Regions:
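N-terminal beta-strand motif that seeds the catalytic metal site of vicinal oxygen chelate
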Residues: 1-22, 71-73, 124-126
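Mid-chain, well-packed structural core segment of small domains
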Residues: 69-87
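Short glycine-enriched loop/turn motifs at secondary-structure junctions
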Residues: 4-5, 65-70, 100
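Short acidic/glycine-enriched loop/turn segments that link adjacent beta-strands
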Residues: 40-44, 67, 100-104
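Short, charged/polar surface micro-motifs in flexible loops or helix N-caps
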Residues: 52-56, 64-66, 80-81
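Vicinal oxygen chelate
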Residues: 1-4, 88-126
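Core segments of cupin and vicinal oxygen chelate
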Residues: 11-54
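Conserved beta-strand in the GNAT
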Residues: 57-60, 117-119
Length: 126
């Protein structure tokens, strides 16, 4: 029974970081905020939909922060250069990394220190 796709990534944020998360993932990256299930209580959670695919990012309150330098989530976009420009215009630093064929990409960090890869998929890896 193979996996079908990654449905969501859960990303830690600091207590009281809801507005910062909304600015980074919502206002800056253009994701649509969706309500988390009421059973979770609400205040320590901010969820976002990515397009119409059903993919989601779930921000949750956790003071331990990001765990390792390689931990990250990747958001696929059509135009990484335009997204990079938007991030930098909003004060977020970006950095290049190893080139992967057909995957123009760069990295940034959300307001909570989580590493975020922004990438386009132009074809197969090789």
């Amino acid at each position: 029974m193979p996996a079908i796709r990654l449905q969501h990534a859960s990303v830690p944020m600091t207590t009281g970081g809801n507005d910062q998360g909304r600015h980074f993932y919502g206002a800056t990256l253009g994701l649509t905020e969706i309500p988390p299930p009421a059973v979770l209580g609400g205040d320590g959670f901010v969820w976002f939909a990515i397009g119409e695919s059903g993919d989601e990012i779930h921000l949750y309150t956790d003071e331990s922060g990001p765990n390792s330098p390689g931990q990250h989530l990747c958001i696929q976009v059509d135009d990484p250069a335009a997204v990079r420009e938007q991030l930098e215009a909003n004060g977020y630093e970006t950095s290049d990394t190893d080139v992967i064929p057909n995957r123009p990409r760069f990295f940034t960090h959300d307001p909570f220190g989580n590493r975020v890869e922004i990438s386009a998929i132009l074809g197969p890896y090789s």
